[in-house]
């Protein structure tokens, strides 16, 4: 192990694996280590017995739930936007050849006490039961504006500069009501709070366009895709990619201790008495706990069920977003469901997650609005985990630390962190203008 590397990556979570893959493709000499004997870190996938051990402290799950190996339960389940930056990143690295994707059946929102399909096009707005007849017309006009908006063509701007006009001002022009603003902001543009209303509308409009483009791309009923066998496939695919480019992976390396010189700059990592030298470190918060601070907690429920989530048109894979205002909360709640159709559970079984930024110490009570939507469950587990963000200055110590995974059930915030870290590490922007047909496996 006594070798020199440009970058040592610690932890095989999704963010670390994507960065390791991107750097390898750039020709950077990478050593990738993990203290665990499995891939994925906090974002790993568990079989049924592992799930049981983690949440019940028992070695074996009851037999009536089916074979343990037929379960691939992602600890950080997140759907990918079909046209989004993560899919583009996967294509950029050519890691898609190791993965198979399948479209997600449904995209829903909880508004006015009901689970409803998210309309994202003028046609869908007119059919939606979310709105009354006049609101449908107003929303249809707004969606048409968004659909036709082209940054480079002023004729489509309707006399507005969206880098100056706020989202609130743009929406006011179309006279949309509070519930419509809620589902557009949180279930189409995928904002996690309401700050976007006072920010330039350009970002929200581009997010809405991404949703509609992703929806059109797979001619599906949702804009999302998900790998067969779950997200646990991603870290392993990146490990294979890294090996192709000469990167080295080492699992089960205890006490990966980061070493610094007198000036506080990183010089290497020691494990089992051997030190590998490096110029830069990329890691998750658990490897450098004195360079991060706690920023909150996520409450989550994981359920095993024998039916789809009610009121989702029998969707075998689905996301339901509950905007914060609908529950008088400060943060949105997310419901995620996947099943045997994505090979994450045995035939007839569904895995559901409910997650949110914790505002109390009681996940069971706090998550009730989400767990109530699930219908009867075979089993349910509740837990909470802390979230951390880096407080170090990477230009001084050469340590690049990811932020803990948030409560969202889509990848938009995760990939934003990855791309920002990539720019900090390399000093360049990642070019994501790729041929999207390379991920067409999802259309099967």
From Swiss-Prot:
SUPFAM superfamilies: FAD/NAD(P)-binding domain. GO terms for biological process: protein transport; small GTPase-mediated signal transduction. Expressed in roots and floral buds. InterPro entries: FAD/NAD-bd_sf (IPR036188), GDP_dissociation_inhibitor (IPR018203), RabGDI (IPR000806). The keyword S-adenosyl-L-methionine does not apply. PANTHER family: GUANOSINE NUCLEOTIDE DIPHOSPHATE DISSOCIATION INHIBITOR 2, RAB GDP-DISSOCIATION INHIBITOR. Belongs to the Rab GDI family. Regulates the GDP/GTP exchange reaction of most RAB proteins by inhibiting the dissociation of GDP from them, and the subsequent binding of GTP. This is Guanosine nucleotide diphosphate dissociation inhibitor 2. It comes from Arabidopsis thaliana (Mouse-ear cress).
């Amino acid at each position: 192990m006594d070798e020199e590397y440009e970058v040592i990556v610690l932890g095989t979570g999704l963010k670390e694996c994507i960065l390791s893959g991107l750097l390898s493709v750039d020709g950077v000499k990478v050593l990738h280590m993990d203290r665990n004997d499995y891939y994925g870190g906090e974002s790993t996938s568990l079989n049924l017995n592992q799930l049981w051990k983690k949440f019940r402290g028992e070695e074996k799950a009851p037999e009536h739930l089916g074979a343990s190996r037929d379960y691939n339960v992602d600890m950080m389940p997140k759907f990918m936007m079909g046209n989004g930056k993560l899919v583009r990143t996967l294509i950029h690295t050519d890691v898609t050849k190791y993965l198979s994707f399948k479209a997600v059946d449904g995209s829903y929102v909880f508004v006015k006490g009901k689970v409803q399909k998210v309309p994202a096009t003028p046609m869908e707005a007119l059919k939606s039961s979310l709105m009354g007849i006049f609101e449908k017309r107003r929303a249809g006009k707004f969606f048409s504006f968004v659909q036709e908006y082209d940054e480079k063509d002023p004729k489509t701007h309707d006399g507005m500069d969206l880098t100056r006009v706020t989202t609130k001002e743009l929406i006011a022009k179309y006279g949309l009501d509070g519930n419509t603003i809620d589902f557009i902001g949180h279930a189409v543009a995928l904002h996690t709070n309401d700050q976007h209303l006072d920010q330039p509308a350009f970002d929200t409009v581009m997010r809405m366009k991404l949703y509609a483009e992703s929806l059109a791309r797979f001619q599906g009923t949702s804009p999302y895709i998900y790998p067969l066998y779950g997200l646990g496939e991603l870290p392993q695919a990146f490990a294979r990619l890294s090996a192709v480019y000469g990167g080295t992976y080492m699992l089960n390396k205890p006490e990966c201790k980061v070493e610094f010189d007198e000036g506080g700059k990183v010089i290497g990592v020691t494990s089992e008495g051997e030190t590998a030298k490096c110029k830069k470190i990329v890691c998750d918060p658990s490897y450098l706990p004195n360079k991060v601070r706690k920023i909150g907690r996520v409450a989550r429920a994981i359920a095993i069920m024998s039916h789809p989530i009610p009121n989702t048109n029998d969707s075998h894979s689905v996301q339901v977003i509950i905007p914060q205002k609908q529950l008088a909360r400060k943060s949105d709640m997310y419901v995620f469901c996947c099943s045997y159709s994505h090979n994450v559970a045995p035939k007839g079984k569904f895995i559901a997650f409910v997650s949110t930024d914790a505002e109390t110490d009681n996940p069971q009570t706090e998550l009730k609005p989400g767990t109530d939507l699930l219908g009867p469950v075979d089993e349910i587990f509740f837990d909470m985990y802390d979230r951390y963000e880096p407080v170090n200055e990477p230009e001084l110590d050469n340590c690049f630390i990811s932020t803990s995974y948030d409560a969202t059930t889509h990848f938009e915030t995760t990939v934003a962190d990855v791309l920002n870290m990539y720019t900090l590490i390399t000093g360049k922007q990642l070019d994501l203008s790729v041929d999207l047909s390379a991920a067409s496996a999802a259309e099967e």
